[in-house]
Amino acid sequence: MEKVLTISVAAYHVEQYLEETLESFLIPEVRGQLEILIINDGSGEGINEIAEKYVDRYPHVFRLINKENGGHGSTVNRGIEEASGKYFKTVDGDDRVEAEGFADLLAYLERAEEDLIVTDYYRFDDGTGEWIDTMRHRFEGKEYGRSYRFEDICDQVYINMHATTYRTELLKKMKRRLDEHCFYVDAEYILYPIPYVETVVFLQRPVYGYRLGLAEQSVNIKSMQKNCLHHETVLEHLLDFYGEACHTLSEAKKRYVERGVARILVSQFKIYLSFEPAGQWKAKIKEQDARVKKDFPGVYQAVENSAVKLLRRSGYLLYPLASKACRRAYHCDQEGR
């Protein structure tokens, strides 16, 4: 019997959280529909000991895959390769799913035909486990459970990685793989499938629970400064993807990809601005922006961030003030040069 959903669990130094993550999938009425790939990304025997308990108890649900360390992108790539379920979702080994929303998702997937299923997600506190807030995908006239042509609604919404469940066949068609040995590949996972996405549906209950408050998270500004080159790599590959795909995409999909890449461009500028002001960071912003304006004008024009727009209008003369404001917002100290 074909599994309805493959879940790829990225497991790297998450021994403290992995059991909670795996337990969250074990809803009796739906677990038989699941293929759960626990992908140990070179993290050692601690992960294996936990995973093997679940493989032994539920051999038709869980599968342990050991691989050399390659980063989050490599676990997603491997998960897509190994997946046999009708649909595919990726879950970090320190996050979880919400029971009622997850059961609703599985019930829908049994009969689903859409390329992309979107569910809202929530954030919870690492210390207390309490639900903090729900991240919703809103647009005018949105109807839950209605199948939309992606092109008809994509100007009104931008879909986060944690909200996505893709048709597996679609992901296997992708010409590009996610970057390996690299942080910040979420945007690649969001955008690389877009040429193949024709239909989308939104479901009402939140499914994915994102753990908030881990000091080592890659979105922490200190981590972003440390891994600035990773972010630059992802931006470059997204620009390459856009350059290749823009000639074949519909206008609506093209605008969607432009907005997505523009978000990463803005994030790159924020990283540069978060360092202590110096000529090298100002030069990087100016050079990057000039190149994008020349080679990828659609992405350049898709930038919506008011601070970046103001910086451009000033001819980058406001760089010192912009850097000061950014550093204040992120509570940066004098380190990280």
Describe the role of every protein-language-model region.
Residues V14-I27:
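Short, well-formed alpha-helical segments that are part of the catalytic scaffolds
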Residues Q33-G42, R63-E68:
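Short beta-strand/loop segment that forms part of the nucleotide-sugar
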Residues N40-E49, G71:
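A conserved acidic beta->alpha catalytic loop
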Residues K67-A83:
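Glycine-rich, basic loop-to-helix element that forms the pyrophosphate-binding segment
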Residues F88:
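Short aromatic/hydrophobic "clamp" motif used to bind/position activated sugar donors
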Residues E114, L273-R337:
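Membrane-interface aromatic/basic loop that binds lipid-linked glycans or pyrophosphate carriers
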